[in-house]
Regions:
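Long, compositionally biased charged/polar stretches
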Residues: 1-628
């Protein structure tokens, strides 16, 4: 058996460390029932000051953008005074007697901000917020942000838009995303299925479906008379995005607005092999699961009917993305492994050493999400299409239906029938993700082979087997379909399992988190809820019907602020481990991994010269862990 100076499988001196951490890391199954989350986040799992520095920098930019939108821009000098005065009012006015100590402490922290003129880059705002975090604590920091946000929202624009240009007025400082200029194009709509914020939905069609009665006339109107449904089906060129998981969702409300969430079915096709452009094309949409209640809409339908139907698909996609692909299948998926690792593996166990850098900030951000984002009255409740209770159920359903062994990237692609580049030539997410998956798999294989020579070594590692048992236990991580008959029997399985955990914590999260800023923050391009029923399509759809489907301006501003923040914080990057984290014998293996990542960066950059840019899986843009 191969061992390292750090760990001996038969006599670990760190067993007491595990016993102690079990008391610190307790499970809670009531946050988002029945999922496993941490009960109380241990102090050592909190974010670093470097992370908070990135956070407050983005908060400042969003704050300035919102202040100008809601209160006007009277020029740079006056704006600096406006910012200073606004924060002073937020801190000082209407302070409750019980909060006077907070006021006094904040005034002591940053008198230069409140009493002096502000610099051109507003860096005093950064200094104030960081000082509050360091000297007053997170509760006071959150209180201050709450005060600022409440006062800031008092002047926000309201109501439905009369033109798409109205949404651009919400970005006087922030850059208007490039996607805002292309999202109306059918090519862009289809491209989102393979390189968008949720490139995980489409499945190859193997047979016609009774609840989606598309006919050749629908198909040929888009793909041409020299093609047919039967031929496309036979050649494996038909792909479906079916949002049936959203069927019967309970529509939410916010303020005076009724919101809607839909369960559409969208058909896409790849042109025949002789075509020079074989990018995915949108063919037809049915805006619900019942064909009797929902007509089939195609690009040849009324212009605004098609745009309305497309938007319904996008709304379903954003809701599935946030609840299932993002929160459920990355954040909470990884969270269960953080807890089991902390509770069962000594700090000097080789698997713990390998995984821990990919867990930094995960328990803290998951706890913040359940307290702030998916709480009643939080951003999810305000912005997404269904009720908060329905959204939480969707998160749980999405994760509980995501079996671990079937979640391996190659298996996922094969199960959906999208693994063959000859059938689906243009799929940037697939192509780039496989590069990262294979590089991580090689690194994990090289690393674990230092410590385990045979399958017997794996089976005899009692800490590892305890970890595997807790990961799947009802009173543990509750991860479905984990292991080989309830344990880990082979080195190959251990390598695959560790690869999936690291891939999910890095590349997969990067692929679904960072498009929130570029592709989802501009509400017209990616609405988080609908504001008109799908039954509108039974009549003659007008431009104003389409505009009324989109979020009203106050909701659009909230969406802009939340998703810009979530998609802007990059903290550490894949493969960049702290010096000395691994023993010397591992360094050549790590060097090899890092060189592979550099080569992958070059390959993806070259690919982007020949396709619409897809950068979310560039190694330099993949964070080391889920921390936002």
């Amino acid at each position: 058996m191969a061992t390292s100076p750090q760990f001996n499988f038969n006599n670990s001196p760190a067993t007491n460390n595990v016993d102690h951490t079990k008391h610190e890391y307790q499970y809670n199954y009531t946050r988002i029932p029945p999922l496993a989350m941490v009960d109380t986040v241990p102090a050592k799992e909190d974010f670093s000051i470097a992370w908070y520095r990135l956070l407050v920098k983005q908060l400042k930019i969003i704050f300035v953008n919102t202040l100008i939108t809601n209160r006007g821009n009277r020029g740079s000098k006056s704006l600096r005074d406006d910012i200073r005065n606004f924060i002073f009012e937020s801190v000082c006015k209407e302070a409750l007697p019980t909060q006077l100590n907070i006021l006094g402490r904040v005034l002591q922290i940053a008198p230069q901000l409140l009493l002096a003129r502000m610099s051109k880059d507003y860096r005093e705002v950064d200094e104030l917020l960081l000082s509050v975090i360091k000297d007053c604590g997170l509760s006071i920091f959150r209180d201050l942000l709450g005060r600022i946000n409440t006062r800031l929202e008092s002047g926000h624009p309201t109501g439905h838009v009369s033109s798409l240009n109205d949404y651009s007025k919400l970005l006087p400082v922030l850059d208007i995303p490039q996607f805002a200029n292309t999202f109306l194009e059918d090519e862009s709509f289809a491209y989102m299925q393979v390189a968008g914020f949720n490139p995980l939905m489409i499945e190859r069609v193997s047979r016609k479906s009774a609840n989606f009665p598309i006919e050749d006339s629908h198909y040929q109107a888009v793909m041409g008379n020299d093609d047919s449904l039967e031929l496309a089906l036979k050649e494996g060129r038909l792909y479906l995005a079916d949002y049936k998981i959203l069927d019967n969702a309970v529509n939410g409300t916010y303020s005076r607005y009724q919101k809607y969430l839909y369960a559409p079915i969208a058909l896409f096709a790849v042109p025949k092999a002789e075509n020079s452009n074989r990018s995915l094309q949108a063919v037809a949409i049915q805006c619900g699961q019942n064909p009797g209640a929902h007509p089939i809409i195609t690009p040849k339908s009324n212009k605004y009917a098609w745009l309305f139907a497309r938007t319904i698909v996008t709304i379903a996609d954003t809701n599935y993305h946030e609840a299932v692909s993002h929160l459920g299948r990355t954040h909470l998926f990884v969270g269960a492994f953080v807890l089991a690792t902390r509770r069962q593996l000594p700090d000097n166990h080789p698997l713990s050493i390998l995984l821990r850098p990919h867990f930094e900030g995960t328990l803290a951000i998951n706890d913040a999400a359940q307290r702030l984002l998916i709480a009643p009255g939080g951003a999810v409740d305000q912005l997404l299409g269904s009720t908060i209770d329905n959204s939480r159920v969707l998160v749980a359903l999405g994760l509980r239906s995501y079996g671990f062994n079937g979640a391996m990237l190659p298996k996922q692609l094969k199960q959906r029938g999208v693994d063959d580049p000859n059938l689906l030539p243009v799929y940037p997410y697939r192509d780039d993700a496989l590069l990262i998956w294979n590089a991580i798999h090689q690194w994990v294989s090289d690393y674990l082979s230092v410590y385990y020579s045979t399958n017997q070594d794996v089976q005899n590692d009692t800490a590892l087997q305890a970890w595997a048992a807790e990961v799947q236990a009802l009173d543990g991580g509750r991860v479905p379909d984990f292991g080989e008959n309830g344990s880990i029997q082979t080195l190959n399985y251990l390598i695959d399992a560790a690869t999936l955990i690291i891939f999910t914590a890095t590349a997969q999260h990067g692929a679904v988190n960072y498009p929130q800023k570029d592709l989802m923050s501009y509400a017209a391009a990616a609405p988080l809820a609908g504001y008109m029923p799908a039954s509108t399509l039974k009549g003659e759809v007008t431009e104003q019907d389409y505009l009324n489907l989109l979020p009203p301006l106050e909701q659009a501003q909230r969406q802009l602020n939340v998703l810009t923040l979530l998609g802007s914080i990059y903290y550490k990057n894949l493969g960049n481990y702290s010096p000395g984290h691994f023993p010397a014998q591992v360094k050549p293996l790590l060097d090899k991994f890092q060189k592979n990542l550099i080569q992958i960066e070059e390959i993806i950059n070259d690919r982007n010269l020949h396709r619409p840019t897809y950068e979310y899986l560039l190694p330099s843009r993949i964070p080391q862990s889920i921390n936002i």
